[in-house]
Each structure stands twice: as C-alpha cells, then as structure tokens.
Amino acid sequence: IKGSFYNTQWKDRNLTKSVTTGQGDSGDTDIIYLTGVNQSHTGVEIESKVALHEMVDVDFIVSLGDWYFNGDANGDYTEMEYNDDNQIIGQTSTEYQYALNGLMVGDMPQTSYVGGLTLKPIDGLRVQGLYKWYDNHFSDWSPDSREVDGDADRAQVWKTPSYGKLDLHLSYKLPEIAGLDMTISAHMFNALDNVYVQDAVDNSQYNGYGDKVHAAHNAEVFLGTPRHFNLGLSVNF
C-alpha cells in the first residue's frame, strides 16, 4: 500500500482584464493585472496491490481532492482625464472585483476510484479489467466570469453527473520467433458503452443565455467516447 497527502497553495495566479477607454498608452485598450487569485489544492491518494494468487492480482486506487479558490480578486485601473487640448487635467480610478472565494476549481474530477482485477491463467497471457469511477467534476469556468456588477454571483458552477466506465485489456506474449519477442494485445474501452459527460463548460458562449444560472441547460457538454476497440502487435528485437 502506498499513500500520499498534498497541500498546495497557489498565490496570485495570472488573471488579466482588458479595459477599453479610448485613451491610454496602448491606444484603445489597456490591460489590468489582477491580484488575489489564490487556489488551495488539498487531497490524499492511496494505491494498493494485492496478489491473491500467483495468477490473480487485485488493484485499488483512491484519489480524494478538495480544490477551491481562496479569497476574492481585485484590480485597480487609473484612467487619465484630458481636456480639449489633450492635456492631462486629472485622473479617475476604477476598482474591479471578482467574487471567487469558496468556488470550486473546475475542469477535472476531484474524486476518483479505480478497481482492477488481473488474471494470468497461463504463461504469457494477461487479462485485466479496470473499473473507473469519477465524481466531484465541476464544469470548466473562468474567474473573469465572476466580475462583480451589483450583487456578487457566488453560486457554484454546474457539477457534472458522476460516472463510471469499464475498460478490458488482453495481452499474450508469443513464443520467440527468429529471435523476435512479439506480443499481441486487444483493448476494449468503455466496454459497457456508458453515456457520460466527460467535460463541460459552465455558462458557455453557445448555451449560456436566458436565466444565466449555473445549471445543465446553460452548460456546453462533451460526451465521453462510446465503446471502442484497439488491436496491437509489438515486436522487440
């Protein structure tokens, strides 16, 4: 059994905002570099392997994560004021705030379980089944979508449904032929042909309209690949 614990604190991750003013050193558009985009990534990972018999192995992997934004972000933009003669007569400062505190990091499952059974009934033959389960997968989203304009939007992004899939693998090492080591293999991915959401974008530019709530009907989703096969032959010399 192997295990690990991690606690990673990301401080001031890069986030910029474009501001169009009609003035500014860069013409019509300036860039604000925001501060306070912090993330906390904490989790545990456990991996175990048990040989029940010389022909039977059992594997189990657990990954439990808790990844979220820690604190809000903000940035100030100072715009020069000009008179009709294009002379500076003052300046105006605008503060931009982003409601990020407590929101979950998206685009990857934070919880996963993997169970595997490997059979080796005869010399050179290996048959394996792997069942993978994914949970706590929050949609991908950008911190700049949480700019405060009136009431702060602090609702969590849409979380995709949990899902599992079964992969099957078979390999057989052929007897040596003319000094060549050859192995044939066959793989069946998503053997149960499950339909699942593999990735999602919260309030996407294509689906996020109308009520703008963080729900499935406003998300852009990408389904996982249906059942598919792979055959292979490897040669070592």
Language model features by range: what are they?
Residues 6-11, 32-143, 234:
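Gram-negative outer-membrane beta-barrel transporters
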